[in-house]
Amino acid sequence: MGLENGIVLQVGGKIDPDAAILKVPGIEKVDWYDNPEPGFTYYDICYWRKYWNIRDILFDNCHAKESNHAYPLTIKQLESIRDDIYYLICDGEDQWDTSRAMWSFEDSVGRLGWDIVRISELIRYLKTDVGYCEAFFYDSY
């Protein structure tokens, strides 16, 4: 099972430093993304380590079949991922399956709430005319 997965934004060039997406806590430029394409900048939107329940949500929404890959995400898929994470939180601690995440519900709920905010801002950003940009789900094992 994938140990690290997340959502990254690939942008041709750079984002305007005053863009709202860069004001959201936790969205940061990253230099570590595997196989970067020249001329592109990458931003970490969400990162999950040992959250197999979140990985399942991502795999289901992008119809991923193999780990250790990057999968492009549409706005519709991002909306579905965001909603699924919201419902995971709403289900509450009683429904939190500790075998599907290394972290407790109590340790996760605030972080997942911020993930919903970051994904929502990513969706807003992608809906604007910002030039070339694309969101990816990455899975590494």
What is the meaning of each model-derived region?
Residues 1-132, 140-141:
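Acidic (Asp/Glu-rich) sequence patches and key acidic residues
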